Every structure is written in C-alpha cells, then in structure tokens.
Regions:
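Acidic, metal/ion-coordinating pockets
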Residues: 1-159
Length: 159
C-alpha cells in the first residue's frame, strides 16, 4: 500500500476529491507527473488532469522539471508544471519556474504568474529580455486561456 502519496488511479482519487468537496470550499490538487525535461504535456497528464477536474478539483498544480502549459478546463485552472524551483540542474530550462497567485474578485477569479529562476541555490524573479518573455509565454500559453502581460514582468489570466 502506498503510504506517502495517492496513486493517480481514478478509482482512488475520484471518490477522495468528491469527499473533500463535501467538507471544503476549495480543493487544490498537487501532482508530480510528466516526462522529466519534457515541455510537452503528455496525453496521460491531460487525461488525468481532466479527470481530476471532473471529480471536483478547483485548481490542479503539477510538477515536472520544466515549465509546461497552463490550461483552463471547464473553469478549472490546470498548471501542468510550475517548473523547477529547487535544483541547480545544469540544463538552463531546469532552472526556470513560475509562482502562481490567485485573486478572488466576486465571480471573476484571476491568476498572476511570476517567472522565476534558480541560480546558486537562490530563487529570484526572472528578469527576462524580450525574447525570453516570448519563449516563456509560448511555453505556458494554451488556447483555453487569455494570457496577458502585466506591469510587473509577469502574466495574468481570468477564469
């Protein structure tokens, strides 16, 4: 029996999320998944994310070693991977990540995304040049979200 985490077996997580929804206003699911160093979201990740959302998860936050897409599925934000914020792996793409912050404003909810980098064991805001911003946005933008640049060098979207 797995005692450190819960399997992504739908027979396990679906009833668990349903039960959590009965007693909680908001359910955030954090998942470690995907192929290391791969920016593309796998079919399996997408299937599991949609199943988690259908089970009632309000937000899904995934982890992989690199940044992956952000999707809005049936008003459930899915951050497939926030990237890597703890390792000084020699691959530069593994030293990039993002912090997400949610703001509730009546019926409109908004997420703020701040690009970060890890260098010499320290995490800081990633002060990107124009090309880096284009790459970052292309790495995370999915057709299901209207991603907008903000005045702080990050991004926002409503759902």
């Amino acid at each position: 029996k797995n005692t450190t985490s819960i399997s992504l077996d739908p027979d396990i997580f679906y009833p668990l999320i349903k039960k959590l929804k009965e007693n909680n206003d908001y359910v955030v699911v954090n998942v470690d998944w995907g192929i290391p160093n791969e920016r593309n979201v796998t079919t399996r990740q997408k299937e599991y994310a949609h199943a988690l959302a259908n089970a009632g998860a309000d937000v899904i936050i995934g982890h992989n070693t690199v940044i992956q897409k952000v999707e809005n599925y049936k008003r459930t934000p899915i951050f497939y991977s926030l990237g890597n914020t703890t390792s000084d792996n020699f691959l530069s793409k593994n030293q990039k990540g993002m912090i997400v912050q949610q703001d509730w404003k009546g019926s409109h909810n908004q997420f703020h995304i701040t690009p970060i980098q890890s260098k010499d064991g320290k995490i800081s805001k990633d002060n990107m040049n124009k090309m880096d911003h284009i790459r970052f946005k292309n790495n995370i933008k999915d057709k299901s979200i209207d991603l907008k640049s903000d005045q702080n060098g990050g991004y926002t979207f409503e759902y």
